From Swiss-Prot:
Organism of origin: Borreliella burgdorferi (strain ZS7)
Binding residues annotated for K(+), in chain numbering: 48
GO BP of this protein: one-carbon metabolic process; S-adenosylmethionine biosynthetic process
Record's cofactor remark: Binds 2 divalent ions per subunit. Binds 1 potassium ion per subunit.
Enzymatic reactions: L-methionine + ATP + H2O = S-adenosyl-L-methionine + phosphate + diphosphate
Subcellular location: Cytoplasm
Protein name: S-adenosylmethionine synthase
A single GO molecular function term of this UniProt record: methionine adenosyltransferase activity
Main location: cytoplasm
GO CC term (a single one): cytoplasm
HAMAP family membership: S_AdoMet_synth1
Binding positions for L-methionine per the UniProt entry: 61, 106, 248, 279
Length: 392
């Protein structure tokens, strides 16, 4: 994965806010998962949401006796309210939405594959290819364009919700392009795009000035990365009044790159939100991130990408491979042996290590699933052991 091959190469990442239609769907899915897990730690959940206009359809499969206790429609309305969709002029109104509950039961065939009779060991909830990644570009071990794209939108959200900028509305996206030197170090911000929904009576000039001066510039930690050549594209389409699901239909799991590493790493295609931890698309992705982050923090490489592959009903991964960051085959084999011997990559092992039976998932699903140090998969508690065993 030697992506940087010459000086002056640029790389780009995008992010979406919690008010983006796809993110509304993700949050509803994960809020329902959390509500189920509060009462049943062993529930099997696969919750999908589609949201269009003022209609929310909640589908998927849930296997838990507590399902009947959860007011799923109320959960959806509360999420929409908390995001800030309190007026139909914004593109959605929690007070008037129609919510259709189309959730069914999990397939008995899948349940039997995951929960083997006579065994406490869980099999993987599905087949899947999963990647974990980390790099040394930021203190959170995430790519610099990706982290900045998310930070800009978080800043905008805070100013909107606090009332500091009253004309901002919930829907927004950002995109950041950064120039790298030949050693794969970020050196200059080339371009920042922000598209943000707004009140109809605000001029584009004021929108541009406010977003640049009050949101973007205060968010950039290293001011030397901004110069007179940095290009700002604020609402390049012009007016962005019609937003939310009135402007664009939202669907759970459609922002998998914004959820992970902003295009800097491979992705197996499986989304995270709405899935309990027996689904390795989610749990193994968190574990692979944990391993990759500890490897980079230990100084093993500037970046590290790990691939895991699973088969439904089988507890151990069928394949483990370092797919980026290590160019020496002998050293890669040594690292692989260390991973196999020191990390439990079964669903049970991952769930226990990362405490994935807790109702934590709503907090994961906005502004990226990685880089939030409150979660177990972001802890750097394996660094010393890695350094002792693997440091050259």
């Amino acid at each position: 994965m030697n992506k940087i091959i010459a000086a002056n190469q640029t790389l780009t990442s995008e992010a979406v806010s919690e008010g983006h239609p796809d993110k509304i769907a993700d949050q509803i899915s994960d809020a329902i998962l959390d509500e189920i897990l509060k009462e049943d730690k062993n529930a099997k959940v696969a919750c999908e949401v589609i949201i269009a206009q003022n209609l929310v359809v909640i589908a998927g499969e849930i296997n838990s006796p507590v399902k009947k206790n959860i007011d799923i429609k109320e959960v959806a309305k509360n999420i929409i309210k908390d995001i800030g969709y309190t007026n139909i002029d914004y593109g959605l109104d929690y007070k008037t939405i129609t919510v259709i509950d189309a959730i069914g039961n999990q397939s008995r065939d899948i349940i039997n594959a995951i929960e083997k009779k006579g065994s406490n060991a869980l099999g993987a909830g599905d087949q899947g290819i999963i990647f974990g990644y980390a790099c040394d570009e930021t203190k959170n071990f995430l790519p610099a364009p990706y982290e900045l794209a998310n930070s800009i939108l978080k800043k905008a959200s805070n100013l909107r919700k606090s009332g500091a900028i009253k004309w901002l509305r919930p829907d927004s996206k950002s995109q950041v392009t950064i120039e790298y030197d030949k050693n794969r170090n970020p050196v200059k911000i080339k371009n920042i795009i922000v598209s943000h929904q707004h009140h109809p009576n605000i001029s584009q000039k004021l929108i541009q000035q406010t977003i640049i001066e009050e949101i973007i510039k205060p968010t950039v930690q290293d001011k030397s990365m901004l110069d007179e050549n940095t290009a700002y594209c604020i609402n390049p389409s012009g007016n962005f009044v019609i937003g939310g699901p009135t402007g664009d239909t939202g669907l759970t799991g459609r922002k998998i790159i914004a959820d992970s590493y902003g295009g800097f790493a491979r992705h197996g295609g499986g989304a995270y939100s709405g899935k309990d931890a027996t689904k390795v698309d989610r749990s193994a992705a968190y574990m692979a991130r944990y391993i990759a982050k500890n490897m980079v923090a230990a100084g093993i490489s500037k970046e590290f990408e790990l691939q895991l592959a699973y088969a439904i009903g089988i507890k151990n991964p069928i394949s483990i491979q370092i797919t980026g960051g290590i160019n020496d085959p002998k050293y890669a084999n040594k690292i692989l042996n260390f991973i196999v011997n020191n990390f439990d990559l079964t669903p049970n092992g991952i769930i226990e290590k990362l405490k994935l039976k807790q109702p934590i998932y709503l907090k994961t699903c906005t502004y990226g699933h990685f880089g939030k140090n409150e979660f177990e998969w972001e802890k750097l508690d394996f660094v010393k052991k890695i350094q002792t065993a693997l440091k050259k």
